[in-house]
């Protein structure tokens, strides 16, 4: 008894448990009363995941630990020394993450198989296989993760040795999505291509004489979806989202092809008119004609309809052109003359009356 008291580690089967990964020995109580164990800590004979759990202190270094065989063959260890909940959870991680899971067939010769006796497990210890001295089931990995425990990292090359169910389900999905993404990138234009197309589209649209509203109406006539002038303007200014720019680009490209093919073809004039209202060209007035109009404006800034008609006939201009010119000239006069000052045509008319009176005298 003196020797046993001086060396409390001599009787291992009934007095202590030794951690195989560290040099510190933790002494336990000689016996633990089975009635004091919680039912959640030790569920004997009820399988949770189909794999009995081995104690991680023994399975980690079964060959290097000289006491592993004595622990496996002792009936007291199997009956009285029970692992705690933390030991069971950590053992479940090591068991599920071990690369030996797929290399051993689930038969009776496996040390973790159901129905394997402790004597058979101890005999496998001498051959170098890890043993499990506890045949009770453990908590699953998912149950462990719910409690916030940490999962040890997998060693390199372990993914292929794992069971297909334990592998990451996103391996094949990532490959498929990557393949689809590469396929979609070939059809999706880049931002530089969109910018270049928007610039070319605006130049060709102006050259053809169509407004942004005309393009929107033409798209509605061709494809049944009318776009507003604001949408076409934002496309040319690159203010739409990248997704909407990609959707609108092929429609505008087809419209350009239709407009280019219709230009110069007399039979397709009605088709162009159906696409939208074509912009009227800006009227250019010669300098001599503009001088005559200025003279008439100083005499009468608001001519009557008969005066506009006779003036248009004398200048060989359209009546609408002459009328619009007088309207624009009056607006220009208002902008140029400060408020309160007499306008130019009033000064001109007053000087004309003065000259007439002087001539009469």
From Swiss-Prot:
Residue stretches making up the POU-specific domain: 186-260
Region of interest called Disordered, as start-end residue ranges on this chain: 100-131, 150-189, 333-361
Pfam families: Homeodomain, Pou
Subcellular location: Nucleus
Keyword annotations: Activator, Developmental protein, DNA-binding, Homeobox, Nucleus, Transcription, Transcription regulation
GO terms of molecular function: DNA-binding transcription factor activity, RNA polymerase II-specific; RNA polymerase II cis-regulatory region sequence-specific DNA binding
Tissue: From embryonic stage 10, expressed in the Spemann's organizer. During gastrulation, expressed in both the involuting mesoderm and the overlying neuroectoderm. During the neural plate and neural fold stages, expressed in the entire neuroectoderm with expression in discrete regions of the developing nervous system persisting at later stages. Transiently expressed in the pronephros from stages 24-32. In adults, expressed in the kidney and brain.
Recorded GO CC terms: nucleus
Similarity remark: Belongs to the POU transcription factor family. Class-3 subfamily.
Protein name per the record: POU domain, class 3, transcription factor 4-A
Organism of derivation: Xenopus laevis (African clawed frog)
Gene (UniProt): pou3f4-a
């Amino acid at each position: 008894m003196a020797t046993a008291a001086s060396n409390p580690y001599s009787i291992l089967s009934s007095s202590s448990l030794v951690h195989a990964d560290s040099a510190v020995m933790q002494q336990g109580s000689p016996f633990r009363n089975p009635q004091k164990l919680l039912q959640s800590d030790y569920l004997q004979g009820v399988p949770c995941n189909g794999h009995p759990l081995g104690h991680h202190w023994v399975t980690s270094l079964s060959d290097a630990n000289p006491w592993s065989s004595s622990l496996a063959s002792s009936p007291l260890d199997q009956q009285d020394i029970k692992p705690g909940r933390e030991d069971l959870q950590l053992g479940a991680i090591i068991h599920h993450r071990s690369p030996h899971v797929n290399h051993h067939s689930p038969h009776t010769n496996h040390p973790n198989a159901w129905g394997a006796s402790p004597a058979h497990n101890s005999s496998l210890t001498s051959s170098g296989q890890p043993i499990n001295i506890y045949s009770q089931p453990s908590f699953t990995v998912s149950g462990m993760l719910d409690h916030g425990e940490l999962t040890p990292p997998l060693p390199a090359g372990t993914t292929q040795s794992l069971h297909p169910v334990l592998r990451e389900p996103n391996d094949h999905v990532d490959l498929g999505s990557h393949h689809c993404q590469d396929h979609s990138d070939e059809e999706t234009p880049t931002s530089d291509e969109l910018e270049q197309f928007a610039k070319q589209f605006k130049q060709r649209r102006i050259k053809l004489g169509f407004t942004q509203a005309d393009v929107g109406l033409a798209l509605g006539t061709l494809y049944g979806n009318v776009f507003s002038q604001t949408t076409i303007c934002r496309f040319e200014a690159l203010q739409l989202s990248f997704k909407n720019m990609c959707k609108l680009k092929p429609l505008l490209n087809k419209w350009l092809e239709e407009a280019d093919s219709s230009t110069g073809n007399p039979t397709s004039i009605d088709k162009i008119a159906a696409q939208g209202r074509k912009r009227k060209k800006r009227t250019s007035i010669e300098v001599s004609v503009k001088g005559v109009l200025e003279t008439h404006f100083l005499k009468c800034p608001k001519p009557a309809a008969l005066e506009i008609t006779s003036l248009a006939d004398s200048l060989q201009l359209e009546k609408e052109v002459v009328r619009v010119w007088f309207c624009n000239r009056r607006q220009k006069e208002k902008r140029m003359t400060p408020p309160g000052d007499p306008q130019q045509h009033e000064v001109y008319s007053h000087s004309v009356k003065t000259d007439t009176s002087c001539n009469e005298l």
